[in-house]
Regions:
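Gram-negative bacterial Sec-dependent N-terminal signal peptides
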Residues: 1-22
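Glycine-rich, small/hydroxylated-residue low-complexity segments
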Residues: 23-484
Length: 484
């Protein structure tokens, strides 16, 4: 888990004076305690380290932190975090954890949260050279969290439960950073949201339930600047307050530069099966939901991609009118991407010109240069990857890209294909007259007339922009239609 990674990294990176110890000793425990206390800026009682054979038993207790919070009506508690460390030599440490966890937070009148994990079992090998776990597995069971939020006279109750979760990760050194991969799986996920009626009229109660028997996520990271990031955190802890940071801003900026680009690339693929959503109107469902996310870090080749795939979409009975039943998509894939932007250049420009002793810290002319640095071509590219919507009556596909920027005319090209337009039109014509669906007929007729028809009845539209701001559909400038 992230908490174990941070605590262990602080211990090893911050407490290097502890040395590489083959056996646990009282002296080693004292050094580790002092190192952790210094990096957590905490007093006695927060960190306890004791020899336990060839390992050290470590306990981190957050109670002294919470005791310093004097806000009226606030209370918090967290089970002390416990684990063991055993020196493996060569800058590697074996990490083991086996405990339940419970935590609660309360801010009177606004928040009341109570969560617990029946069991956390984790083991891994922490590598000082990487600043993270070369390998790690974590198993959690019996996770529940109940939260009550009160805002503007409305009370919302949120409940989350997960039967089991398994996480396995691996990291390898790669230059000044690390490459990593991992997989997360969980079972019996359920979330309930219940909102009471508000004090004002027109605010009825609402209840929702989201459930999935299984979820999996595969994730990768390239060029992760883990060690540099944690060294920045340690530096910030050692320089509390804005005055301390301003006094050492040159060093601070060097630490920030060392963290860049944060990562070269990260990606994640999430899959959920048999998703159900319970609402006051009935139950909706998805047989399979897929989400893909990919992004580059603070690099010159900026990139962001998100894709969604839904199979077996179902809506509550009675929600869709009979004429539209066969228009409801059973499958769709939407794939968006953004590219041709630069994050490295503006980051360098900002750091090179940042002066925390002045106000504003960045001169206005530098702020104006940042936009140009982000878009060296004057625009970004926005793409629609191969996307599709499939229903019983039709199959719609689309793909294309466009460029857009503050100083340039949008330009792009897209290809759209549709099979089943006549069937769609027949379904719309069958709608009750009061719904006004028949009014769409002229537009459908025009669209069909502009399409190129294939042998199988598939219609194709190639949509392009012109430098003058026009729009061509299969070569016809639609902006000049109708006498314009």
């Amino acid at each position: 888990m992230k908490t174990s990674l941070v605590l262990l990294t602080v211990l090893l990176l911050g407490g290097s004076s502890a040395g590489a110890m083959a056996a646990a000793t009282p002296e080693g425990a004292q050094r580790l305690t002092a190192a952790l206390q210094a990096y957590l800026t905490a007093g006695p009682g927060v960190v306890t380290v004791t020899p336990a054979g060839d390992a050290y038993a470590v306990k981190i207790d957050a109670a002294p932190f919470f005791a310093k919070i004097k806000e009226p009506g606030f209370s918090a508690s967290v089970t002390p975090f416990e684990f063991t460390l055993a020196d493996q030599g060569g800058g590697q440490w074996k990490f083991d954890q086996d405990q339940p966890i419970a935590y609660s937070f309360k801010a009177e009148g606004t928040l009341d949260m109570n969560c617990k994990i029946s069991s956390i079992k984790g083991t891994g090998i922490f590598d000082e050279a990487i600043g993270g776990f070369a390998s790690q597995t974590v198993d959690l069971t019996g996770m529940t969290c109940d939260e009550t939020l009160t805002e503007q006279g409305k009370t919302t109750k949120i409940g989350i439960s997960i039967a089991t979760m398994h996480v396995a990760t691996a990291l390898t050194a790669a230059g000044a950073g690390a490459d990593g991969s991992g997989k997360l799986t969980l079972t019996d996920f359920k979330e309930t949201v219940s909102t009471a009626a508000g004090e004002t009229a027109g605010s009825p109660p609402m209840d929702f339930t989201l459930a999935a028997p299984s979820l999996s996520e595969d994730f990768t990271g390239k060029g992760l600047k883990i060690r540099a990031s944690l060294e920045l955190v340690a530096w910030a802890v050692a320089h509390p307050g804005p005055d301390a940071v301003k006094a050492a801003q040159a060093e601070f900026k060097d630490k920030l530069r060392a963290v860049l680009p944060v990562f070269q690339n990260i990606s994640a693929v999430v899959s959920m099966d048999k998703v159900t959503v319970g609402t006051m109107m009935g139950e909706a469902g998805i047989d399979k939901l897929g989400i893909t996310v990919e992004a580059n870090g603070v690099v010159a080749e900026g990139k962001l991609r998100e894709a969604f795939t839904v199979d077996g979409l179902r809506l509550p009975q009675g929600l869709i009118p009979p004429f539209a039943t066969d228009l409801l998509p059973s499958h769709f894939t939407i794939d968006f991407n953004v590219s041709d932007f630069d994050l490295a250049a503006p980051a360098k420009l900002a750091l090179d010109n940042l002066d925390m002793s002045k106000e504003p810290q960045l001169a206005p002319e530098i702020e104006a240069q940042l936009t140009a640095a982000i878009m060296p071509k004057g625009s970004v590219s926005i793409g629609l990857g191969p996307s599709e919507i499939v229903a019983k009556l039709y199959d719609l596909k689309a793909e294309g890209s466009m460029t857009a920027g503050p100083m340039s005319m949008p330009a792009g090209r897209a290809t759209i294909t549709l099979k089943g337009l006549d069937e769609v039109m027949a379904a719309l014509q069958a709608a009750p007259p009061e719904m006004g669906m028949q009014q769409m007929a002229p537009m459908v007729i025009v669209a069909k007339g502009m399409a190129k028809a294939g042998a199988d009845g598939t219609l194709t539209w190639i949509v392009e922009s012109t430098p003058q701001g026009g729009v061509l559909v299969n070569g016809v400038d639609v902006t000049k239609m109708g006498g314009q």
